[in-house]
Amino acid sequence: MTPEARLAERVRRDLELLSYPEREWLTPRTTRDGQPILDVLIVGAGQSGLSAAFGLMRERIRNLLVVDQNPLDRAGPWLSFARMRTLRTPKYLTGPDLGIPSLTPRSWYEALHGEGSWERLGLIPKETWAEYLSFYRRTLGIPVRPETRAGALRYDPAERAWQVPLEEAGDTQLAFARRVVLATGIEGSGNWHVPEWISNALPPDRYAHTRHDIDFGSLRGRRVAVLGAGASAFDNAATALEHGAREVRLYFRRKSLVNVNAYRWAEFVGFLKHLGDLGDAEKWRFISQILQMGQLPPADTFRRASEHDGFHLHPGSAWKSLAMDGERISIETESGRHEADFVIVGTGFVTDLKLRPELEALEPHIARWADRYTPPAAERHADLGRHPYLGPNFEFTERTPGEAPYLSTLYNYTFGGLLSLGFGGASISGMKYSNPRLIHGITGSLFREDCEAHYQSLCAFAAEEF
């Protein structure tokens, strides 16, 4: 038996010891024409979707399914567009394990690499994290249907369930689910953003977003301009240089790089667990301040790029315009004019539920923060205003009261929950607290919906003990 197999047995034994209460408590339901109705459908099989499934399974919700558009165990960025070498989160994180010591990343890593290996490890390599998530899925028996894309959701009041088109290999089938969890990651409440003034000015083969597939080999000997100073901008700059780019110039608006990490400040129980318990004004003040402080590149990421002679920083250099000048890209910045052969856009993502195909029919009914709260002028932030205004357990709320009450059975466990509930929807660091909050909401919602049936079950209970 391999060390990983022995650890998997230990995990299952630990779960058996903690399995009370074991009785199944949800009655299977079908549609009027006999099609099974899932208790929960989870869209997204990355770390958030898998941990949500595990949390529900521990609460005896087993009639569930996780779908993901990617191949099995390739959900999330780790084996695709993530170009960092390691996670940015410190290795001592916990969260997906849900309090099971044998299921922690440390237990798994030490089982594979031996005693003392954890102490020698700095940050967790991204490929190692992907391997851990695969072990997690296999050990827990989480039902995942890969290469399956969820279409536009619609609520069916007659069935008291969501209709979800699931497309797989060109074939679309309609699934029904009492509850749906969207665990679609950082872009799950919007999409990656390339400003129109860039996409309108350049041919498609002359620019890419950090999220895009990039043929870095084609950049050998070329001049690359990177817009943005976040971690992913530095990751892509370093990758281009490692593939032989002649030079990479990184441009950003601030007068100097951010070198204080507000996310490290936030790593304490009060903020991670209880931001969602604050009032709207306090939530807005905290999150807008974190965003205003900015995102820095981790020290290792900065060194990875700056060790190359061809790497140049341009602070105070917001881009004013750009255009093709023959075969060259001409860039006008606040610090002067520059030229490049290729542009990498590191401007992150935009929050806008209108960009989510699965919410196409629902977006007009979903409450946003701009519908519920007006911040002081000094704290105004357009992107925050577009964040969904979520309930206490990541559920959507209705924009007009009474118009779409069914939205309370649809959960947004994505980065879009940042303003309402803090880190957690797509963040490893907040998962320890966000997962129980989500699971509590779903189990409570299902129990309330079935309350009368449970009461009738109690009245009919007649198991004599002597």
Where are the regions a protein language model picked out?
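Core mature regions of organelle-targeted
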Residues: 73-83
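Flavin (primarily FAD) cofactor-binding/catalytic cores of flavoenzymes
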Residues: 1-70, 75, 118-243, 249-466
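Flavin (FAD/FMN) cofactor-binding and adjacent substrate-gating region
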Residues: 84-115, 264-278
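Generic N-terminal leader segments that precede the first folded domain
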Residues: 48-51, 79-80, 94-95
